[in-house]
Each structure stands twice: as C-alpha cells, then as structure tokens.
Design a protein with these regions (language model features):
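N-terminal active-site segment of His-dependent metallophosphoesterases
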Residues: 1-38, 173
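Short, glycine-anchored, charge-dense loop/turn motifs used at functional sites
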Residues: 6, 103-110, 240-247
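Cys-nucleophile CN-hydrolase/nitrilase-fold catalytic domain and related Cys-dependent amidase chemistry
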Residues: 17, 26-112, 178-205, 215
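Short glycine/proline- and charge-enriched loop/turn segments
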Residues: 53-61, 121, 222-228
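Active-site catalytic loop in hydrolytic enzyme cores
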Residues: 63-66, 76, 92-198, 272-276
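CN hydrolase (nitrilase-like) catalytic-core segments centered on the catalytic cysteine
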Residues: 66-84, 152-256
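Short beta-strand scaffold segments in enzyme catalytic cores
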Residues: 87-89, 100-103, 138, 237-239, ...
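A conserved C-terminal secondary-structure "cap"
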Residues: 267-290
C-alpha cells in the first residue's frame, strides 16, 4: 500500500465565523496542494473558543449536521480535492447539543463522533454547552485507511486511544483547542504533547493533534454575568510515528500546516509483531470501569 500523507492545520480563530471558514478552506486547499490526503483542522474552528464564558445566547451557534455551514462547504471541498476531512462542529440534535466531528471522505459523510469527555473549569466551561457524547468511540473506514477520532479533552484519557486501537485505527486524530491556564502558573504544552506521545507508543499507532493558536479574551458584561477570562492558545500541533516520536511539529504562535507520511499496511504488521494486543488480559482490568 502506498504511503498516506497526513496534514495537521494550525490556525487562529476570530469572532467572524465566515472569515474563519474561508481561512480553514484555504488552509485545506494549501495542504492538498502539498499532497495531503488526510487533513485535520482544529476543534470548533468556526468561532473563537466561546466556552471560556457562559452565555445562553451562544446555544444558537449549534446547528444540525445538515444545516452547519462548515459541513456544507467543506463537503464540496472534500469532494473537489479527493481528501479525507474531519470537521469539528457545535451540533444540535433536536434538543441536545454536542461537540461533534463529521467525517468527510471525498465528499461523502461517513458519520459522526460526539466528544466523550467534557471538561468543566473556569477556562473550559464545556459542560454548560455540550452533552457527553453517545456515539461511543469511532473508527472510520476511509479511502486513506482506518481513522480514529478523539476530541481535545478525550486526548488526555488513555482509554480513548486504547479503545480506538482495539477498533483497528491506523491513526488517531485529535482536533484540539487548548492554551495556557494562568492558574497553573505556566502552560501545559509539554505535558499535552507527552500524553499523546505515550498513547502512540503504548498502542503502536501514530497520533496527530491540530490546535488553534492566538490570544482570546472574554470581557465582563451583563450577558455573561461579568465573567472575565483569557486563554493563550499555544499551538504546538504535531504528528508522531507509532513509537510516539514527533515527526513534525508546529510553532506556538504561527498559523501553519505540518505534514507526515505513513505506511499503514506496514504499521499493521508492526503492531502484530509487538504482540501488544495478543498479550492483553482484559479480565484483569475490571478496576478501570468501576
């Protein structure tokens, strides 16, 4: 099997959803022009990260998959460019709201994954906006190979990566929106990368993470009950090999596209040779699900 070229897109997001979508489309086109067949955009790239504050009015941002403008536009782009393109959206399903990825493959909608783990603190108030996903972990059989998806906070849980590996993922993708947390007195960029590098190494499956970049501020107002917050999204998007080694990495504060090539057929053989999954003892792991 020929190698697959994977791209991770790192971009800043403004308050203009139309402008953000246009930028994302151009970056996808740029990646495809460099030969990328599987292109990963950041989490919720249509808008600035609205989860820094609580505003009931922001519920209106959620649209059904069919009504979402990014899905509509990027479906056409995916078909035109013959690429696999996961699209991160704020989804409305009747009266329930989710943080969702729509998997597009050469213009076809292969299905959705809804974020499993929903964070909740001052900077990431996602439980106010999203219901925990009900799809279960998903691996999509695409024209590039079997693609597993986790969304941002999912990437911190080893169970996510292990489930996706057990489902046959050739690569695990993590669209992300993460930045420095002032309460920590620093930032988590190194910890963030090492966590996913470990998932790759433990499962013999490469991972890719696409983060946003830029400073996003929330100013106090009556509508948000006078909340104030600032997140400095630290970029640092990356792609690893199956041992967790970073093959390509982005800077902290630039918009850029990074690339890596993979022979998924060879990696499947490598996983078999390691015997990692042959030697598992699921009957001994009950504590994990207690």
């Amino acid at each position: 099997m020929a190698k697959v070229k994977v791209a991770a897109v790192q971009m800043s997001c403004s308050r203009d959803p139309i402008g953000n979508l246009r930028k994302a489309e151009q970056l996808v086109r740029d990646a495809a022009a460099e030969g990328a067949e599987l292109i990963l955009l950041p989490e919720l790239f249509e808008r600035q990260y609205f989860c820094q504050e609580r505003q009931y009015g922001y519920y209106r941002f959620a649209k059904s998959v069919e009504e979402n403008e990014a899905v509509r536009r990027l479906t056409m782009v995916s078909e035109e460019l013959s690429v696999v393109l996961p699209v991160s959206i704020y989804e409305r399903d009747c009266t329930t709201l989710y943080n969702t990825v729509v998997m597009l493959d050469c213009g076809k909608n292969l299905g959705i994954y809804r974020k499993t783990h929903i964070p909740d603190d001052h900077f990431y108030q996602e439980k106010f906006y999203f219901t925990p996903g009900n799809t279960g972990f998903k691996v999509f059989d695409t024209s590039c190979g079997k693609v597993g998806i986790g969304i941002c906070w999912d990437q911190w849980f080893p169970e996510t990566a292990r489930c996706l590996a057990l489902l046959g993922a050739d690569i695990i993708l993590y669209p992300t929106a993460i930045g420095s947390e002032p309460i920590l007195g620093g930032d988590s960029a190194g910890h963030w990368q090492r966590t996913m590098q470990g998932h790759a190494a433990a499962n013999i499956v490469p991972v890719a993470a696409a983060n946003r970049t830029g400073l996003e501020k929330v100013l106090p107002c009556e509508e948000n009950a006078y909340q104030e917050s600032t997140l400095n999204f630290y970029g640092s998007s990356f792609l690893t090999d199956e041992t967790g080694k970073i093959l390509s990495g982005a800077e902290r504060d630039t918009e850029e596209i990074i690339f890596a090539e993979y022979d998924f057929a060879l990696l499947r053989e490598t996983r078999l040779e390691w015997g990692m999954f042959r030697d598992r003892r699921p009957e001994m792991y009950r504590r994990i699900v207690e």
